[in-house]
């Protein structure tokens, strides 16, 4: 029985750390959860769309967690220009641009219309030239009236997939990630796009998978706001497809937690519950539990390290710390609440449950 695994430089390619007191609480927890490299989301208020702001935000994060490597991103909006994309890339200020369809998730009001991306094609062209990554929140906004086919939380991701395929056809060398996949149809689409891929360096379109979507179905959030997120967890067949993809060892599926902290009072509303699951403090142990249950621990390093590093082309010279993550057998109990002892309290994913694995850090 495996008791210890050297995971090397682990990476979580979809992380929310917010601002202010919440940021101060959760940013150091990235390393606590066994993650070395974190790709940071730009959906602050207002969104990150300027060079000065993304540089300042990274400085703030680096001060809070000096041993964590932060990869930064812009928020896709009309404020971006091709010249800004080129400048930010050449200054190594960003690794990608995140696309939020307007209104589908937290702080997405400034997002774009996913029915027509043509206005942003000059941006995508500049990104392709700079080898930047386009990160897609792959959902269409809900539509419940008129003669149009209804779109709702259970089919919003599937409705978005034709837009993903069109973007790839129009920009075949642009690196694209369908973030936090939740559906069997999304997994099939990513596999179809990659049917001729032989190795990790060939991947142009990838998908991130979260920890919580490998555990949850619709029944788990319908009566529990702590498990409510966007995109929502779906049906048992969808979860089965996600788990199969995660443990497959295919280089176009890798880890992005979409860990999204909210103050406990914002998750306890009877109306307007904030979407987001907080998983950062135990990120790698959650994933290890799934891989162990699937008898696939030999593929864990690819999912939480190698494939993400390859897709984002992270070099050793860029990392803040070369320490390696060692996963080892040691039971731990997830606390009911994580707090700064002052004003901020958050409920972690699977609060009160036991995990079989822990993480420590060792020099490489």
Curated annotation (Swiss-Prot):
Modification sites for N6-carboxylysine: 98
Keyword Secreted among record annotations: no
Induction context: By N-carbamoyl-L-aspartate.
Stored Pfam families: Amidohydro_2 (PF04909)
Sites where the protein binds Zn(2+) 1: 14, 16, 98, 258
Reaction catalyzed: (S)-dihydroorotate + H2O = N-carbamoyl-L-aspartate + H(+)
Enzyme nomenclature, EC number: 3.5.2.3
Co-factor: note: Binds 2 Zn(2+) ions per subunit.
GO BP, one annotated term: pyrimidine nucleotide biosynthetic process
Amino acids binding Zn(2+) 2: 98, 137, 180
Listed cofactors: Zn(2+)
A GO cellular component annotation in the UniProt record: cytoplasm
The keyword Hydrolase is assigned to this record: yes
Swiss-Prot/TrEMBL keywords: Hydrolase, Metal-binding, Pyrimidine biosynthesis, Zinc
Pathway in which this enzyme or protein is active: Pyrimidine metabolism; UMP biosynthesis via de novo pathway; (S)-dihydroorotate from bicarbonate: step 3/3
Alphabetized GO MF terms: dihydroorotase activity; metal ion binding
Domain of life (superkingdom): Eukaryota
NCBIfam families: pyrC_dimer
HAMAP family: PyrC_classII (MF_00219)
Extra facts: Present with 12700 molecules/cell in log phase SD medium.
Assigned protein family: Belongs to the metallo-dependent hydrolases superfamily. DHOase family. Class II DHOase subfamily.
Protein name: Dihydroorotase
Organism per entry: Saccharomyces cerevisiae (strain ATCC 204508 / S288c) (Baker's yeast)
Lineage per the UniProt record: Eukaryota, Fungi, Dikarya, Ascomycota, Saccharomycotina
């Amino acid at each position: 029985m495996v008791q210890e695994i050297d995971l090397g430089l682990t990476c979580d390619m979809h992380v929310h750390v917010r601002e202010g007191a919440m940021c101060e609480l959760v940013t150091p927890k990235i390393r606590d959860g066994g993650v070395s490299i974190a790709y940071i989301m730009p959906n602050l208020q207002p969104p990150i769309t300027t060079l000065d702001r993304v540089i300042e935000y990274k400085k703030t994060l680096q001060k809070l967690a000096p041993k964590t490597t932060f990869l930064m991103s812009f928020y896709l909006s009309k404020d971006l220009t091709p010249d800004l994309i080129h400048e930010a890339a050449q200054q190594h200020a960003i690794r990608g641009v995140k696309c939020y369809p307007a209104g589908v998730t937290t702080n997405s009001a400034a997002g774009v219309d996913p029915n027509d991306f043509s206005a942003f094609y000059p941006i995508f062209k500049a990104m392709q030239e700079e080898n930047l990554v386009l990160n897609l929140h792959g959902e269409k906004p809900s539509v419940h009236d008129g003669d149009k086919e209804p779109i709702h939380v259970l089919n919003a991701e599937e409705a978005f997939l034709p837009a993903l395929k069109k973007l790839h056809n129009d920009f075949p060398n642009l690196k694209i990630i369908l973030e936090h996949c939740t559906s069997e149809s999304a997994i099939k689409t990513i596999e179809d796009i990659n049917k001729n891929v032989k190795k990790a360096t060939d991947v142009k379109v990838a998908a991130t998978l979260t920890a919580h979507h490998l555990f949850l179905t619709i029944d788990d959030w319908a009566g529990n706001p702590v498990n409510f997120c966007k995109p929502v967890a779906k049906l048992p067949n969808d979860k089965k497809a996600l788990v199969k993809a995660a443990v497959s060892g295919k280089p176009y599926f890798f880890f992005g937690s979409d860990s999204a902290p909210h103050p406990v009072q914002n998750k306890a509303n009877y109306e307007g519950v904030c979407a987001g699951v907080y998983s950062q403090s135990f990120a790698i142990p959650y994933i290890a539990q799934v891989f162990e249950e699937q008898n696939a621990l030999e593929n864990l390093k690819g999912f939480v390290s190698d494939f993400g590093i390859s897709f984002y082309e992270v070099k050793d010279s860029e990392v803040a710390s070369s320490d390696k993550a060692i996963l080892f057998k040691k039971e731990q109990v997830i606390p009911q609440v994580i707090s700064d002892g002052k004003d901020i309290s958050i409920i972690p994913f699977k609060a009160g449950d036991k995990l079989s694995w822990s993480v420590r850090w060792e020099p490489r």
